A protein has these predicted regions:
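Catalytic domains of carbohydrate-active enzymes, especially glycoside hydrolases
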Residues: 1-4
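Catalytic pocket-lining loop regions of alpha/beta-barrel enzymes
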Residues: 57-58, 71-178
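Residue-level signal for short, function-critical loop segments
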Residues: 6-7, 127
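Active-site gating/metal-coordination segments in enzymes
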Residues: 7-102
Length: 180
C-alpha cells in the first residue's frame, strides 16, 4: 500500500475530493484527508461523512503551517473522534516552512499529551519530525501508538543509514514507515 496525503491548502474540501477520486482509481493508494480542527468539523459523524464515506482512511494535520497547537482543545476533540473511527493521524510538520509557520507547533514532543490521552490512536510523525529528530526517538520509545516515516531529504547519504541504525538500537524498527 502507498499512503497519499492531501496537501496543505486553503481549500481542504477540494483537496480531499481530488484525493478521494485518486484513491478510488488506484487500489493500492491509501488516502489521508487534510483537516484543520480549528476550522473544520471534528465529530465522529462529520468525519465519517467527510473521510470514510469518501474512501479515505486517515487524517493529515499541518499544525505548524496552519498555526494551531497540536493539543488545542478542538484538536483533542478531533483525536477522540478519530480514535473512535480507527483513523490514524499523520502529523506533517516539517520543512520547508513558510514565514508564517509556527515552528513550536512542529516539535514532536507536543504529541506526547495526545499519545497519553488517546493510547489507541495511531499517530505518524512525518519525516521523522525533522529537524527535531531526537524528540521523535523519545516518542517512539515511549508510546506504542507512535510511528514515524523516513521520507526525509538528507543532506548526506549516510544520514538515513544512521536513522535506521538508531531505530534498530532503540528497538523501534517496527514503527518506522519507509517512503519517498
Amino acid at each position: 500500500a502507498c499512503i497519499v496525503l492531501a496537501g496543505c491548502q486553503a481549500d481542504r474540501r477540494s483537496a480531499n475530493e481530488a484525493l478521494s477520486d485518486y484513491v478510488r482509481q488506484n487500489s493500492k493508494a491509501v488516502g489521508f484527508a487534510t483537516v484543520n480542527p480549528t476550522e473544520d468539523p471534528v465529530t465522529a459523524r462529520q468525519l465519517k461523512k467527510e473521510v470514510l464515506d469518501k474512501d479515505l482512511r486517515g487524517l493529515v494535520l499541518y499544525c505548524a503551517e496552519e498555526r494551531f497547537h497540536p493539543a488545542h482543545s478542538r484538536a483533542m476533540n478531533l483525536y477522540e473522534a478519530a480514535a473512535e473511527l480507527n483513523l490514524p493521524i499523520f502529523f506533517h510538520n516539517c520543512p520547508p516552512f513558510s514565514q508564517q509557520a509556527v515552528m513550536d507547533y512542529a516539535r514532536p514532543f507536543q504529541l506526547d499529551e495526545i499519545a497519553r490521552t488517546f493510547p489507541t490512536l495511531k499517530m505518524i510523525v512525518g519525516r521523522m519530525g525533522f529537524p527535531f529528530i531526537e524528540q521523535t526517538w523519545c516518542l517512539l520509545g515511549k508510546h506504542e501508538n507512535m510511528f514515524a516515516d523516513l521520507t526525509i531529504i538528507p543532506q548526506k547519504v549516510w544520514e538515513v543509514y544512521n536513522l535506521v541504525m538508531s531505530a534498530y538500537e532503540a528497538g523501534v524498527m517496527d514503527r518506522l514507515l519507509f517512503g519517498s
